[in-house]
Every structure is written in C-alpha cells, then in structure tokens.
C-alpha cells in the first residue's frame, strides 16, 4: 500500500541497487515499478520465497520493511531477511495486535536488527508535513505520486469503500473539502 510504496520511493533515492515490492494488488505493483522498485512479486500468484531466492541469489534481503498489516508479515519478514540484515516492522496487525508466528530458529540464526516503528502516530504533524514538503522540493520524494483518486468530501464513504476493498486501482485518496473533484 501507500507505506510500502513510500519506502520503495525513498530507498531507491537512497541508492538501493534492488528494491523489491511484494503486493497482491496489481495497481500497487505497477506503481512500485514507476516510483523506484526494480522488481515486484505477486504473493497471491507466485511463491514469494522462491521468487526472492531467485532475485537475491539465495542471500536474502538486506533491509525488509513489513507494512502489510498482516499477522503473518512478521514471521515472513524474519524468513526473508538476510543474515545480519535489518527488519523494519511498520505494521499493525489488526485488533489483537498479535503475530501469527515467531520463527524462533530463523530469529536466532539471522541475528537481524529489528526496528519497530510507531505507525501513523506523531506528536508534531505540521513538522512532519514540512519535512515531507522539503523532501519534495529537493526531489527526493513526491507523495503526490501515490494519489490515485480525488473525491469530494460528500463521497467519503465511497472513497473508504474503494480503499477497504482495493477497488479501481486505489492507492491514496485525496478528499477535497470544497466540493472538489473526481479523477
């Protein structure tokens, strides 16, 4: 989704030689390739582990970012991270907050650095917005590239339904409070 795409955009700018986007939604895989990913994998059709083995020569991934919101994402990330790699957990896992598995042997063998994050939480939103604007002005990241739809505020439920059901290639929706508009 939008968080994973943002990481794809930024890591490519930071010089990552290979950026792999994993997403079951075709529109998001296409967007990932447009904004910096070198490869994408559809985990609903492809064996993700086999595809990653081929793409990395069996070495695993240096930096894995889990932004799936899926309880299985944590365990999968530990399985695909390179030995002594880094795993950034940027994912909430539903109302229980529990992960489905913790592959302890992978954890011990990989000796990966695990970095937890605070998802969508900030005490200074205007500061964060200014930083994002500065990144855009320097050509580092353009959050506008993630916008897939504009809707007027009166269509908030339609926008939410599109987002919740992954309809119409939705990635990020901009709500316009002044009766804006349809695209």
Regions inferred by a protein language model and the residue ranges of each:
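C-terminal substrate-binding/catalytic core of Rossmann-like NAD(P)-dependent dehydrogenases/reductases
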Residues: 53, 97-148, 157-158
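C-terminal hydrophobic helical "lid"/dimerization subdomain
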Residues: 75-78, 127-183
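Mid-domain Rossmann-like dinucleotide-binding core that forms the NAD(H)/NADP(H) cofactor-binding site
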Residues: 1-46, 50
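Conserved amphipathic alpha-helix within the SDR
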Residues: 48-58
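Glycine-centered, small-residue-biased loops immediately flanking beta-strands
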Residues: 85-86, 112
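N-terminal Rossmann-like NAD(P) cofactor-binding module of classical short-chain dehydrogenase/reductase
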Residues: 62-65
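Acidic carboxylate diad motif detector
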Residues: 90-91
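Helix-to-beta-strand junctions that scaffold the AdoMet/dcAdoMet cofactor pocket
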Residues: 81-83
